[in-house]
Amino acid sequence: MTAPTPDPSIPPTAATAVRLGLPGGEAVTHRDVAANGARFHVAELGDGPLVLLLHGFPQFWWTWRHQLTALADAGYRAVAMDLRGVGGSDRTPRGYNPANLALDITGVVRSLGEPDAALVGHDLGGYLAWTAAVMRPKLVRRLVVSSMPHPRRWRSAMLSDFGQTRASSHIWGFQRPFVPERQLVADDGALVGDLIRDWSGPRPPEEEDLAVYRRAMCIPSTAHCSIEPYRWMMRSMARPDGLQFNRRMKRPVRVPTLHLHGSLDPVMRTRSAAGSGEYVEAPYRWRLFDGLGHFPHEEDPVAFSTELVNWLKDPEPDR
């Protein structure tokens, strides 16, 4: 798929850089919904049980373009949202801790008029999906996480595994004031393309697709808002609010869970993600995609979407 080529003479805005079409020309619906005191942009396709898709860093809803079509074709109401501070959603001055971001997600479920949803989260979106399943279990029908361990395993790996600490060096770099924001938008967001390319396996997204993410990062304030959650996640480790969050996440996930990971993921090591099932008291399936990196849903969208749809349709997913 090749993304629409933006006009470099036009400064990026949410309207021009985010409200895009889908690869096959399907009539995706863009709209805004209110939740948890903010406005969120969503892209929607299809009818049926709600599947809410949550992007990671450094992306926005468009990362799920292939899965929106696959899910809609399979009989689901597929909705990809932009997280707080990203894409077409509000850039608020605060509220980027994971507990509040999880309330954004469950609030969007309610604003869409649904009693619950299957949450599908990648990277940071996966971290928040784990969190939402613990905090608001009645609103989460099923849970799918890609490229992200359970928050408690993430914390443990970051503190005790030098290999994981080194793999996540970008997160440590985010702790500096001002500098990361400037780096992300320099040269029309060139670093965004470099990160996605470097974190992918042998089949990274096309350059035209990387240009879409670069342009979206250059929307004013997006770079700052994109890294604020990671600042909280690191700086709060020894603070009372972070310790309270970590204790809260000891409560088990009690919904069927599918955990997907790329064997070549250089950002989140397989050994850090594997074993997250210890926090799930429900059917849990671990699936490792050989030869894929940090973005399996983009690197091999057919394999990822097939695994996702088959599992969602399985009435009794295995442990």
Q: Which role does the model predict for each range below?
A:
Residues 60-61, 127, 292:
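A short, glycine- and basic residue-enriched loop/turn
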Residues 41-88:
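Conserved HGGG/HGGXW glycine-rich cap/lid loop of the alpha/beta-hydrolase fold
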Residues 292-301, 305:
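Catalytic histidine-centered segment of alpha/beta-hydrolase-like enzymes
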